Regions:
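Rossmann-like NAD(P)(H) cofactor-binding subdomain of soluble oxidoreductases
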Residues: 53, 57-154
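NAD(P)+-binding Rossmann beta1-loop-alpha1 motif at the extreme N-terminus of oxidoreductases
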Residues: 1-49
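Short, intrinsically disordered, charge-balanced linker/junction segments flanking boundaries
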Residues: 156-161
């Protein structure tokens, strides 16, 4: 299975690092070339609750076209940044790609899974202009929630609380 994690923040790095211990081929897609270079050189660095620093080597890129279509694309960005991931998601999507957004707030796809009166409605507050609803087929979505507490520290280490 080929899995791309889009977003190199605390949640994206945690999910990518955890998935790297599975047989799946994991790729972390980040926005900035300098972030890709840092992770490529140092791995994903995480501080455990006990303070131990771990380094997880991972395939990282700032060019989603370089890794091609994936079986699963996990979106790990803030809800307001989702629209900016659509070009990366397009590059990673094949006919059977499943999308799993791990975002904060009310997900844009929520009304699609509800009965009337919400069914088929677009919530403008979370999907202005219906851009996300039009770009991502709701039948290819897996809803996700995370209850993990992680933060980016100034030194590039992800602290898992």
């Amino acid at each position: 299975m080929r899995i791309a994690v889009i977003g190199g923040g605390a949640i994206g790095c945690l999910i990518a690092a955890r998935l790297s211990s599975t047989p799946a081929r994991i790729a972390l897609v980040v926005r900035r070339p300098d972030a890709a270079a840092d992770i490529r050189q140092n791995g994903i660095r995480m501080a455990t609750p006990g303070g131990r620093i771990t380094r997880t080597p991972i395939h990282v890129t700032d060019d989603p076209l370089s890794i091609g279509p994936q079986d699963l694309a996990i979106l790990c960005v803030k809800a307001y940044a989702l629209k900016g991931t659509l070009s990366a998601l397009s590059a990673l999507s094949g006919p059977d790609t499943v999308v799993m957004p791990v975002v904060n707030g009310i997900p844009w796809w929520y009304p699609a899974a509800q009965p009337a009166p919400l069914a088929g409605r677009t919530l403008a507050s979370v999907d202005p202009g219906g851009v996300l609803s039009q770009a991502i087929d709701p039948t290819r979505l897996i809803g996700a929630l995370t209850y993990v507490a992680v933060e980016n520290q100034d030194d590039g280490v992800i602290r898992h609380v």
